[in-house]
């Protein structure tokens, strides 16, 4: 008879056997990818579906005599920050690699979203030898204005890192994005895939050879917006892990070993990549029985134990409504990223029929899946507010999101420029945004499950590319496994 102190972790409160109807995950998946069209910078194609957006940033890079058009605006502003953009690209690519077979026609839409970013990241990496461009736009000037990206007249300052002003973090994240995406395109566009991988190797070598945090090199241009708070070791591990998966080159195995263990976080985000790297590297230990990566398998499981609510080592708070609550500012970014890791590690466990322990609790794959599903469902409307935090999904969703293009009249409605200050009248109104940024996931409710839906409350009402990117994988998983 089993010890009374040893029990199977069932997460009964979060069981899949629930009393509510599951959301339409397939619809949410489609809309989560459509969102990226609303964030596009550059010349828009003829098949642009969010028609209220127009081409913008067509001279980006000109101040440095290079072409840096394209890519994505990170959130509700008109700045291109490559650090979170590259993470967005890596997570979209990981979603496609792990769940592509479950995505149906959305796999091609995912590739389109990825390529919009990688075309730009390639420009940033290849435009000037010995230099990596890492952003366009003056965030301090941009944030003082409320204007459409099509009209922006704030400085389009170009930022870069180099051997004398290093940025191992942003370089390694860029390498991760290029390496991960190279696998996405390996069969459908081999030539493009080879270019991505070759560039990833060069950028990763740059990150390794010239050590330093980009926050120190660029200071107020990236801080406090996207400071590298966790340092750059996590990105070196993350980047090397992706190069290893893309190449299987022993060089990256040895480099990963040289880095040793890392922090034991209870978070995963555009800044802190440790948990993501652990899960990615654990894949080799779980699926291939590769002892070189057993350390990271243990680290991945320690991370899961910090997330599961009834685990003895849990350090994660949950709202009364069941939502993970990590930090007040844009909490859903952590929810979607962690949910991706839960779903993906459970996938690895299921394929090999593995379990692990959190103290005396035996963790089975469905414990992770049940928690993942609860988070996905909460975001999609199964919550105390009965509100979907994905714009345009269901009838009750955020109507006043903190997003310049969405909140201002489109060019079709008002062709003349509003100027830097002309848009603040729209910013201050209680009217719903005139343009629906379909699929955007906002920062989310507070710790009391409350969401005021106020445009000036950017910590809760601002969407961001990295919130959506991590959500694509879990949506694809549940869309494919949902019972009719």
Curated annotation (Swiss-Prot):
InterPro entries: 6-hairpin_glycosidase_sf, 6hp_glycosidase-like_sf, Glyco_hydro_9, Glyco_hydro_9_Asp/Glu_AS, Glyco_hydro_9_His_AS. Induction: Down-regulated by auxin (IAA) and abscisic acid (ABA). Its main location: secreted. Specifically expressed in root cap cells. It is found in: Secreted. The active site is at residues 77, 402, 453, 462. One of its GO terms (molecular function) is cellulase activity. Keywords: Carbohydrate metabolism, Cell wall biogenesis/degradation, Cellulose degradation, Glycoprotein, Glycosidase, Hydrolase, Polysaccharide degradation, Secreted, Signal. One of its GO terms (cellular component) is extracellular region. Gene3D superfamilies: 1.50.10.10. Its EC number is 3.2.1.4. Glycans are attached at residue 370. SUPFAM superfamilies: Six-hairpin glycosidases. It comes from the Eukaryota. It is an enzyme of class 3 (hydrolase). The keyword Iron does not apply. It catalyses: Endohydrolysis of (1->4)-beta-D-glucosidic linkages in cellulose, lichenin and cereal beta-D-glucans. GO terms for biological process: cell wall organization; cellulose catabolic process. Residues 1-21 form the signal peptide. The sloughing of root-cap cells from the root tip is a process of cell-cell separation that entails cell wall break down. It is important in plant development because it assists the growing root in penetrating the soil. Belongs to the glycosyl hydrolase 9 (cellulase E) family. PANTHER family: ENDO-1,4-BETA-GLUCANASE (PTHR22298). May be involved in the sloughing (cell-cell separation) of the root cap cells from root tip. This is Endoglucanase 3. It comes from Arabidopsis thaliana (Mouse-ear cress). The gene is CEL5.
């Amino acid at each position: 008879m089993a010890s009374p102190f040893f029990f199977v972790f069932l997460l009964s409160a979060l069981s899949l056997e629930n009393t509510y109807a599951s959301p339409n995950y397939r619809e949410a998946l489609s809309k989560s990818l459509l969102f990226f069209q609303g964030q596009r910078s550059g010349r828009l194609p003829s098949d642009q579906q969010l028609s209220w957006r127009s081409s913008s940033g067509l001279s980006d890079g000109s101040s440095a005599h290079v072409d840096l058009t394209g890519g994505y605006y990170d959130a509700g502003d008109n700045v291109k920050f490559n650090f979170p953009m590259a993470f967005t690209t890596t997570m979209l690519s990981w979603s496609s690699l792990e769940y592509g077979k479950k995505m149906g026609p959305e796999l091609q839409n995912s590739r389109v979203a990825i390529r919009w970013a990688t075309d730009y990241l390639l420009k940033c990496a290849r435009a000037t030898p010995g230099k990596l461009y890492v952003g366009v736009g003056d965030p301090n000037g941009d944030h003082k204005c409320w204007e459409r990206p099509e009209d922006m007249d704030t400085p389009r300052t170009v930022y870069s890192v180099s051997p004398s002003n290093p940025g191992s973090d942003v370089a390694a994240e860029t390498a991760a994005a290029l390496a991960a995406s190279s696998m996405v395109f390996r069969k459908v566009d081999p030539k493009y895939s080879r270019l991505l991988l070759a560039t990833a190797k060069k950028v990763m070598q740059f990150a390794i050879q010239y050590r330093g945090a980009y926050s120190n090199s660029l200071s107020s241009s990236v801080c406090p917006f996207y400071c590298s708070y966790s340092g750059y070791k996590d990105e070196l591990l993350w980047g090397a892990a992706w190069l290893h998966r893309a190449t299987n080159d022993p060089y990256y195995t040895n480099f990963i070993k040289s880095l040793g263990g890392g922090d034991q976080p209870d978070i995963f985000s555009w800044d802190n990549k440790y948990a993501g790297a652990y899960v990615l590297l654990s894949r080799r230990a779980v699926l291939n029985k590769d002892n070189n990566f057993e350390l990271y398998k243990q680290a991945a499981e320690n991370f899961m134990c910090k997330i599961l609510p009834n685990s003895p080592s849990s350090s994660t708070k949950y709202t009364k409504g069941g939502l993970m609550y990590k930090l007040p500012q844009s909490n859903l970014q952590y929810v979607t990223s962690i949910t991706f890791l839960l779903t993906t590690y459970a996938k690895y466990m299921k394929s090999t029929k593995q379990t692990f322990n959190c103290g005396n609790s035996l963790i089975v794959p469905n414990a992770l899946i049940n928690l993942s599903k609860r988070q996905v469902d909460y975001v999609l409307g199964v919550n105390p507010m009965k509100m979907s935090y994905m714009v345009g999904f269901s009838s009750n969703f955020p109507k006043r999101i903190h997003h310049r293009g969405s909140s201002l009249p489109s060019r079709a409605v008002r062709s003349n420029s509003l100027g830097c200050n002309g848009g603040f009248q729209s910013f201050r109104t209680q009217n719903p945004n005139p343009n629906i940024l379909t699929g955007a996931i906002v920062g989310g409710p507070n710790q009391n499950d409350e969401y005021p839906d106020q445009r000036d409350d950017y910590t809760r009402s601002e969407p961001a590319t990295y919130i959506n990117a991590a959500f694509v994988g879990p949506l694809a998983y549940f869309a494919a496994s949902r019972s009719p």
